[in-house]
C-alpha cells in the first residue's frame, strides 16, 4: 500500500541540508492541512509559513537551538485560537451557508448549540480544544509531505510564549502549539537517518472489542 510505504519512509529528520522545497510541494502540503477534518468544521487555528531566515534565526534559540529550525526550507507554525468567540463561530457557519447556497435548520440549530456552549467556557479549556484540532491538520501536513518526498520534523520543544511574541500571535488571538520544519534530510549529519523505525506492535497498540 503506497500510504504505508510513505509512512515507513518518513521519520523525524534531525538535520536538514538547507535545500529549498518547491512552492508547489509546499502548497500541496498546506492544502492537505487545510482539508483536514476538525471538530464542528470550525478550523480553529491558523498556519503561519515562515520563509524569512531572520525570523527562523530568532525562533531557533527559543526552540532548544534545534538546527532544523534554521536549516529547513519552510517553517510551519500551527497556531490555535486563544478561545472560541461568537464572532469566530458565526464566521465559519456563515461561510458554510454561503458556499452551500442555502440554510439548513438542523445546521442552524447546531450553530446555536455551539454558541450557547463554547464562548462561555474558560479560555484555556477552549485553547486546548482548538490546539487538538490544529494537531489533526499538523498530522495531515506530515503525511502530505511524505507523499511529496519531503522531510519534516514535528517539534513541541519550544517556548510558545516566545514564539508568539516573535510572530505577534497574541495580538491576533492566536497561540502557537506546534512547529513543523519542512525540508530535506542531511544524510551526513543526521544521526537518525539510517536507524530502524521503532513502533509498538499492533498487538500492543490495538485492542479489539468484539
Q: How should each PLM-predicted stretch be described?
A:
Residues 1-210:
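Acidic, surface-exposed loops and disordered segments
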Amino acid at each position: 500500500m503506497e500510504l504505508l510505504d510513505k509512512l515507513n519512509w518518513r521519520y523525524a529528520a534531525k538535520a536538514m541540508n538547507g535545500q529549498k522545497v518547491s512552492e508547489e510541494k509546499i502548497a500541496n502540503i498546506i492544502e492537505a492541512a487545510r482539508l483536514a477534518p476538525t471538530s464542528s468544521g470550525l478550523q480553529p487555528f491558523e498556519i503561519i509559513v515562515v520563509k524569512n531566515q531572520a525570523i527562523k534565526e530568532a525562533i531557533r534559540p527559543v526552540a532548544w537551538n534545534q538546527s532544523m529550525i534554521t536549516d529547513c526550507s519552510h517553517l510551519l507554525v500551527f497556531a490555535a485560537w486563544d478561545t472560541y468567540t461568537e464572532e469566530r463561530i458565526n464566521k465559519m457557519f456563515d461561510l458554510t451557508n454561503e458556499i452551500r447556497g442555502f440554510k439548513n435548520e438542523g445546521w442552524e440549530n447546531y450553530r446555536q448549540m455551539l454558541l450557547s456552549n463554547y464562548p462561555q467556557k474558560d479560555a484555556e479549556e477552549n485553547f486546548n480544544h482548538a490546539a487538538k484540532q490544529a494537531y489533526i491538520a499538523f498530522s495531515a501536513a506530515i503525511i502530505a509531505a511524505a507523499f511529496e518526498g519531503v522531510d519534516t520534523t514535528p517539534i513541541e520543544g519550544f517556548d510558545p510564549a516566545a514564539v508568539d511574541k516573535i510572530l505577534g500571535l497574541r495580538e491576533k488571538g492566536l497561540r502557537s502549539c506546534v512547529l513543523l520544519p519542512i525540508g530535506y534530510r542531511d544524510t551526513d549529519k543526521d544521526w537518525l537517518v539510517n536507524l530502524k523505525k521503532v513502533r509498538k506492535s499492533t498487538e500492543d497498540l490495538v485492542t479489539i472489542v468484539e
